[in-house]
Amino acid sequence: MKSIAQEHDCLLIDLDGTVFCGRQPTGGAVQSLSQVRSRKLFVTNNASRSADEVAAHLCELGFTATGEDVVTSAQSAAHLLAGQLAPGARVLIVGTEALANEVAAVGLRPVRRFEDRPDAVVQGLSMTTGWSDLAEAALAIRAGALWVAANVDPTLPTERGLLPGNGSMVAALRTATGMDPRVAGKPAPALMTEAVARGDFRAALVVGDRLDTDIEGANAAGLPSLMVLTGVNSAWDAVYAEPVRRPTYIGHDLRSLHQDSKLLAVAPQPGWQIDVGGGAVTVCANGDVDDLEFIDDGLSIVRAVASAVWEARAADLHQRPLRIEAGDERARAALQRWSLMRSDHPVTSVGTQ
């Protein structure tokens, strides 16, 4: 039996919420990634640090990485700008010096003030971004400057919890200018395609925790995806995800990379019988306890219910709400573990919590 990691020659792995939360690795991440023999590329929407700085942070946490293993939204944003502007054009930086350095590396001139007459504005996460930075950017955008956001993640997973992400700052400028930026990072496919282009890869797999960036980005790039439940989105979010945000596989954490892809796939599961009708998805246990435990990593019910809900949604032109119900006590306990028994809840965008 091959593991899902062995089936793919390249893993495009998200960082925040997938590999680590702030300064803490996620469960089993260090050991799991050390055992993966496929090429590992860390693909991050976080534009606050350079590729070398990201690699150094990974090494501090016990991982093995170099700058060549890291693909950042700052790099993607700089490439996007270089394709739109003449060499030497001025770009107002709302973000860190790492972002400014990426802009300079593609032959553009980083500036920080509206008085420098910028041709474009690029915005990435910085913990020190303040009102004055946003004010300079707002003036430039209103004056016609091209506006590029490294990403629009509304939150940033940390060991303290979810903190404001770059998307929260982007929202402030949207409100102030009435304009929308071009987005360089996930879910736009450019970041994924740039990563895959770093080698002759034939079977890449995207691994991440966010439906609205990692998984939607994988789907946009035509790549399979493994959703892990260590960051922003939950099992319930996956069950009710919009089609563009539906993962191919669901696992607990990065230890799932060493499981069989057939176990991880969102599909009907032998341990559960599911009936759909009357606005309800009814789940019953199927088989004896020993057999169920043998094939189940605890998430089989999530994969089974997600498969059933997605199929039901595809067949319902009116997109009516669905209830998830337990047909027996074993199903009830499994559904309650993942908070899936929320009745009469309309299906909406669930990219963030």
UniProtKB/Swiss-Prot annotation:
Keyword entries, A-Z: Glycerol metabolism, Hydrolase, Magnesium, Metal-binding
Annotated residues for binding of Mg(2+): 14, 16, 209
Entry keyword Metal-binding: yes
Necessary cofactors: Mg(2+); Co(2+); Mn(2+)
UniProt catalytic activity: sn-glycerol 1-phosphate + H2O = glycerol + phosphate
Note describing how the cofactor binds: Although Co(2+) and Mn(2+) support eight- and fourfold higher catalytic efficiency than Mg(2+), respectively, Mg(2+) is likely the physiologically relevant catalytic divalent metal ion.
CC per GO annotation: cytoplasm
Disruption phenotype: Deletion of this gene results in an accumulation of G3P and G3P-containing lipid polar heads.
An example Gene Ontology molecular-function term: glycerol-1-phosphatase activity
Pathway listed: Glycerolipid metabolism
Lineage: superkingdom: Bacteria
SUPFAM superfamilies: HAD-like
One of the GO BP terms on file: glycerophospholipid catabolic process
Hydrolase recorded as keyword: yes
Residues the record marks as active site: 14 (nucleophile), 16 (proton donor)
Family: Belongs to the HAD-like hydrolase superfamily.
Job of this protein: Dephosphorylates D-glycerol 3-phosphate (sn-glycerol 1-phosphate). Is the final enzyme involved in the recycling/catabolism of glycerophospholipid polar heads. To a lesser extent, is also able to act on glycerol 2-phosphate and D-ribulose 5-phosphate, but cannot use D-glyceraldehyde 3-phosphate, dihydroxyacetone-phosphate, UMP or GMP as substrates.
UniProt domain comment: Crystal structures of Rv1692 reveal a unique architecture, a fusion of a predicted haloacid dehalogenase fold with a previously unidentified GCN5-related N-acetyltransferase (GNAT) region. Although not directly involved in acetyl transfer, or regulation of enzymatic activity in vitro, the GNAT region is critical for the solubility of the phosphatase.
Subunit-level organization: Homodimer.
Protein name per the record: D-glycerol 3-phosphate phosphatase
